[in-house]
Amino acid sequence: MIKILTGRQTDPVQEKILEEAVKNYQQHPENETFIIVPNHIKFTTEVRAINKLATSKNKSETAVKNLHVLSFSRLAWFFLKDAEQGLPTQLDDAASAMLLTHIIEKEKDNLTIFETINSGLVQQLYNTILQMYDGNIDLDNIDETNLDQETKSKIHDLRIIYDAYIKEIAGKFSTKNEVQVELNKVLANNKSLSNASFYFCDFSHFSLQETLTIKLLIRKAQNVILGFKTKLGDINPQAEAGDYDYVIQQTIKRFTSFLQERNINYTVNNFPLSSKPTNRENLNSLWTESINKVDNIKKHVQLVKADSRYAEAYFVARSIYQQVALGNYRYHDFLILAPDLKEYETYLTPILRQNKIPFFNDLQQEMKYHPLVVLIESLFNMYDEKTISLNTQSIIAILKTHLMIPSWYKEEAEFIHDVDELENFVLAHGIEHNLWQRPFSHFVNAEVIRLDKMDEEIAKLNRLREFLINKITELLEKLKKEESSQKALTMFFDFLTNNGIASRLEQWRNDANDAGDLQQAQQPEQLWDLLIQLLKDYLMINPEKFDVDEFFNMLINAFREANFSQIPSTLDAVNLSELGMVQTGGYKQVFIIGATSGNLPAIQKTPGFLTPENINQLQNSFASDAYLEDNQQLNNLDQNYQFGLALALAQDKVYVSYPILNASNERLDSSIYYKRLFDYVDSEFEQHDLPEKFNDLLSFITSADASLGYLSYINSIDSSKEFDELLRITHEQSPQKTEIVLQASEFNNQPEDIGQELAEKLYGQNLNSSVSQLETFYENSYEYFLTYGLRLHRRLENEFDVIQAGNYFHETFDRLVKQLNKEHIDLASLNSFELERMLNSVRNVMKNEGKYAQLMNDPFNEYLFKCLDHTTSKVAHNWCKNLNKTPLRAKYSELSFGVGEKLKGLSLDVPNLSGNHRVDLRGKMDRVDIAHLADKNQVLAQVIDYKSSAKKFDLSMFYNGIAMQMVSYLDILVKNNQFFAGNNELSLLGAFYQTVTRQLERLNSNKLIDSQLNIRDNVIDGKPKLMYTGLINNNPQVLTEAEPFLDNSSRQSELYSMVKTKKNGTFSLPTDRSFSEEELELLLEYDEFLIKEASNQILSGKIELNPYRQGKSKSALTYSDYKDIFFFDAMLRQNQYHEITRLSKKDLLSKIKERLGKED
């Protein structure tokens, strides 16, 4: 009997199939009865079938002999186990990936499109080869006349790889789908199937070989019953692409056509329409557009719009928890589906665990993230044919796997501590590549980290370094020399066992078993078993000449394609799965999460090795008994049907939800499926991240522990008697945690003042500080406390960053100036060759010293140094050329001032503080230029500060204490008149930024062309970017003394930005950066006021989390290393920026006078 049973997606097709199969088994127990279902639901279907049999016997359990519930692969093994000639060892996905990598590497000279190998490409190739094998396709018989070049190239390479693959496995291995081919061979010759019955259900599509299996059984078996779910529960031979059930109707059509062509009798049974359809059936009719409208559908469908994925996941957990707690449901009554479960792995499973909800996640877990795989990849990253490349990232990765722990460590915690310390030391000293071969004691003289002064600690770390480096280099050197595959694999295996890696995996397994985590306990064993199998497979694939690159590539690609097998830890558990995967029926409630426009429908856009266009071109070249399906197209055509199946799974209620924001706070739109459902129900529930009032609390209440955070939040905004009762019940169950959480809810994210006494212990009675430190205080006083009070800092890394580049600039110019002064050479007297020779002399000395020498070990850093040298050369040559236009010469470089220095700093009494306290300002000026005006008994001075990017003096930042540097430097000059001018008068020109750059103007810049459309020659070489900019004295006499050429009318300064003379002989100066001598004195006075004010706050122990913000993009938090400590949130009442608004010169002077109590 051949029968096709069809029903709607809500009809119990599987129940009917199981019922008939069990009935057949009871009537003919001596005959074989087979129930064939997708592998994904084999276990649950088997349980149902046996339960149904037991129920029919009025028993709670029963034994069976000839009733089999199998997947297609298990059906194959069932028949092949007794076959005369068994199959060779099956080549699994991982081993196949390894073999294909070997073939591609071997044949790469003959291939046209394979330049590099990656795991994704190998997987695509593997799937295509399986399709070719499964589809009975002969690549040699493909007519290439009408193929485009891309398709021809792919077929060319595919033919080479496919032939080599089949040749390699012949007689040694079988592919995972070859078992299906062999099954059909056995079935074709089997003469004992006449009494067997086969029942198929829950399939919507079959492969060519599976289709052939069913056709063979139709001709040989006593009974073949096929169950399908279609749109209307009937067969529609005229279904077209785009129709709701096109894919499954095409599947049915293949069988009906086969039966009709061979005049085989068959019956078609349909499920009858229900006279009183349930809400579930009504929803399905709406979804398939069989009806237009129905009442009361809201009882069956709930739409949820969540604030975030966290809120969405919490809604699911809360709904399940509450309904189970009320006794209406068991955990196994719930199914959670998502288009992509990976999006929810950091939300859903932790929330379910927090609420103690048992669950089974059937999403496959990849092996490639396991520590053993990381270790193997890291070993390969250090291998090179010429030399062993000891890269730091790989070495640290191996240490952090915790798989190679030397025997002298008795406690793992001690090893972990040393690994952290070793990483700190290595990063601080820039240890990379061959530097790993040197003892750590060779680096400590640099004294860049605390560890450098701890000899015993360095000895411990060096012992760990020696152990690891010796083991790694010994293994890789041996593998590089070895030619025998057998011996090489033995070396590799010995490395894993002799260094305790195997025993470490065994320990992890035992620990997981002891903790009751059966899933985790299986992973080390599965991984080790696969590794052993891969080593055996490699030996069979490549028994002769061993190749290290090939070995590691094959091993890594194999692991990347491997997954851990999953087992449920309990039968009563919520099931987590993905849309599109076959599910058994019987769920009472289904949650479909992640219903965003980007996820549903889940349209596949990334093709396989052969694109849909390639496949369409090839279709006409295949023989009649061969075909190649476009799985991507098949998936895309089946999306609506699959979503309908998901909706039909829920007996009582289905929830469909989506988040309005993703993890990056980007707005998400709901899926077109969600919008269709909204048209039916016209309502949605909004799940917020937090309850807004007490009445919202029901949407958040689960267990006492999980709900406590929400309760404490409500307590802070909307307390009530009812709430107090809830809190009392929670306190009874978890008193200690409740008290801690309630205290935390009252947390004020503002640091507390430490008081004068503690501040004095941190900073001393007198404050010895620099300008930049006080600027940090005004940027954010809490950052000042963390940096200079507690002395916290981010981990030191000896990398060539912006700070290092700036240091290199400064040191180059410092050494140049000192060399010139030492040899009494006027820079203006040097020609270009002499200047460059002096610069090179300075650089060579620098690069052989300290931190720069370590950085030079990296070839890329060497290139960066050359770029910096070009930049400093350009600035130095520009400076040299400009010296004939000014009498100012560099007298001092990196001039330090403060306590203990030749140059006095600012020493100011700190007012309004008990006791006697003083602030001593120290620092260093990049350069001070001096010009002796002998005829006037006067000395002209300017301060130069090097900057790696363009900078202007910002009045508003100065007023708020964040840009005091330049004014403070001028104050130092004034306070040290004797040092700079002796008995002469010191005249201040100003304080200027010198941008160290070789940047040119862009070709489309309007600065290159004047109003007459002529090119400005002085702009072409980027010279304006090298002009001084900053605070300047607006006294005309001082200006002409600094640049004598400006004594003529209509002259543009060649030294100072935005300075020129007008036709009438007066000066045009930058409005907000030029000051009279009286105004400069006012700035100096206010600068000292700021210094004293900051010192008072610091020494009194006052601390505020008060970062500045200027505009929308610039703030004290932009580049702060302490954001994780601040936990600053401008949305909180306690956390506010202190805003800085732009000031004009007039506003600045007015505000300063007001603050200093001076009359305007």
Swiss-Prot record:
It is an enzyme of class 3 (hydrolase). Despite having helicase-like domains, this subunit does not have helicase activity. Pfam families: ADDB_N, PDDEXK_1. Signal peptide: none annotated. Heterodimer of AddA and RexB. This is ATP-dependent helicase/deoxyribonuclease subunit B. Its EC number is 3.1.-.-. The heterodimer acts as both an ATP-dependent DNA helicase and an ATP-dependent, dual-direction single-stranded exonuclease. Recognizes the chi site generating a DNA molecule suitable for the initiation of homologous recombination. This subunit has 5' -> 3' nuclease activity but not helicase activity. InterPro entries: ADDB_N, DNA_helicase_suRexB, P-loop_NTPase, PDDEXK_AddAB-type.
